[in-house]
Regions:
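Catalytic Walker B motif of ABC-type/P-loop ATPase nucleotide-binding domains
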Residues: 153-157
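Conserved ABC ATPase signature
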Residues: 87, 128-132
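Conserved ABC ATPase "signature" region
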Residues: 95, 99, 106-124
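Helix-to-loop junction immediately C-terminal to a conserved catalytic motif
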Residues: 47
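Conserved ABC transporter NBD signature motif
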Residues: 55-66, 70-71
Length: 243
């Protein structure tokens, strides 16, 4: 289980996260909010790339800073088409990331083959990443996020800028990961997270304003017709701080 307790984060005088607390058991969670709501800050704190000014991030009751390098084997992170090396082939990139995760050379070929097959990228694995389409780049990022079979997966805008067919393909791969994993997905594409999310987390101006199932949220906010209408109703007047 992932637990955040009373997380705060400031950028100079601006409060990016304000007393954020969450408990996430295994399942898929959609993190929704407008630009500047605090999504990126929250994701970076969960991944350990950013330290909060206050509060704790716990994995199975242990603070992540106490886990050190062990946390790399627990978490998988796919940023929004960042951190890729265009000159690398997909296979070479995954080998590099597998090394950082501590996967042994003996296990590496089988593990890379597994994740490539999962995202349907086996045939493209020997091509330079610079020749990939946007959807292929996103799939290779998801492949590196699931190297080593992590129990916590963080995906930042996994379907942004993709065509409808590719978005469906990515969504299906994310849904198939659910089970014993905690999967946190930040997105603006409401229709991509609605069918697969266990719960939706709504964040506005650095505060968590609600967390519930899609059905309960839509009922709670006045019988709105789906999550997209709910999103527009809650966030259309948002005047938030920097993300």
């Amino acid at each position: 289980m992932l637990c955040l307790t009373n997380i705060t984060k400031k950028y100079k005088e601006k409060l990016a996260l304000d007393d954020v607390s969450l408990e996430l058991a295994p399942g898929i969670y959609g993190l929704l909010g407008p630009n500047g709501a605090g999504k990126s800050t929250l994701m970076n704190i969960v991944t350990g790339n950013l330290k909060p000014d206050g509060g704790q991030v716990l994995w199975d009751g242990k603070e992540i800073k106490s886990l050190g390098a062990q946390y790399r084997s627990i978490i998988g992170y796919a940023p929004q088409q960042q951190g890729l090396y265009d000159a690398f082939t997909g296979k070479r990139f995954l080998a590099y990331m597998a090394t950082l995760k501590g996967i042994s050379k003996k296990e590496m070929p089988e593990e890379i083959a597994r994740v490539l097959s999962y995202v349907n990228m086996t045939e493209a694995a020997n091509r330079p990443i610079g020749t990939y389409s946007g959807g292929m780049k996103q799939r290779i990022l998801i492949a590196q996020a699931i190297l080593g079979d992590p129990k916590l997966i963080v995906l930042d805008e996994p379907t942004a800028g993709l065509d409808p067919k590719e978005r469906v393909r990515i969504r299906e791969r994310i849904a198939a990961l659910a089970g014993d994993k905690v999967i946190l997905v930040s997105t603006h594409v409401v229709s991509d997270i609605e069918p697969i999310a266990k719960e939706i987390i709504l964040i506005k101006s650095g505060k968590i304003i609600d967390q519930d199932t899609v059905e309960h949220l839509c009922s709670k906010y006045g019988r709105v017709n789906g999550l997209e209408e709910l999103y527009m109703r809650i966030f259309e007047e948002d005047t938030s701080c920097a993300d």
